[in-house]
Amino acid sequence: MLLGDVFRLFSWLTSLVGASKTVASSSSENAISRSVFLSRTALLLGGLMLGGFVWGTTNRYRYNIKKLRLAIKGLPDALKGLKIVQISDIHSGSFDNKEAVAHGVAQIMEQHPDLILFTGDIVNDRASELEPYMDIFSRLKAPLGVFSTLGNHDYGDYVQWENAAAKIQNLETLKGYHKQMGWQLLMNEHVILEKGGASFALLGVENWSAKARFPKHGQLQKAYEGLGAQALPLKILMSHDPSHWDAQIRSSYPDIDLTLSGHTHGMQFGIELPWMKWSPVQYMYKQWAGLYSDGQQHLYVNRGFGFLGYQGRLGILPEITVIELA
């Protein structure tokens, strides 16, 4: 019925374009009232929107590989060409196609990264959501390692638990799953990595958001402990929520060269063209997708590997980010 009405409205609009002035000025018997015009137009727009969202469900596993070359001031030659793959917001509890997820992991490995970084939200609520996909994500390997951090969904805050102990156990189980997959989870801590004789720091903090409704477990000062005054040419930070960058990182930690975040998903809905990008999420997050720079500091916000809520991607595809340092 809806499609028939949409077709009839389209036919009517087409007839208006081709109508002569004589026909247009004919008796009101054949004219359409303003109310009917508005209702049919609304029906057409509604049909187009519905069709768009249905089509968007076919994009939920259509991984988009975003490649960028990022210049870091004072980067030693040994670190130039360092290739980092970032993924974020896996949300394994939303998946329904292991083959498609495995293909996404294969696409990551085809990039031959030196380092793989995951910036939080591996589940929707429960650690058990990850279990069917652990064998797939265990395939992620890189010479310098696979590192991860936590996002707001990883704490189990959005589900009713039998008791407080069950919630705590869920998080401990999830931490163990990271380790079982060969991922090193950084929770307010850092590691020193080396390539070609040059060392650099990778820091990871728990979820920290400038938005009141999201948790502030991240402790960047704690992540610095033991780092001291080492004159390292590069510091990379994993922090799930991009609002952390403006609220704390840029002003208080100017030595962090690159921050990697996720969280927004680009709202899984928007418009991306070579010359512009738009999504409703930009009215909530100043930095919501892609690269942002302020002087020598940079933030990259990944659009997410998975999906949550709406089982699709309309205009904003799931993302695998490949960053090559220069």
Locations of regions flagged by a protein language model:
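Non-catalytic terminal accessory segments
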Residues: 1-61
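Generic detector of short, well-ordered, non-transmembrane alpha-helical segments enriched
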Residues: 33-34, 66, 181
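Alpha-helical transmembrane signal-anchor/signal-peptide segments
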Residues: 62-71
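Soluble catalytic domains of enzymes that build or remodel membrane lipids, polysaccharides, and related
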Residues: 75-326
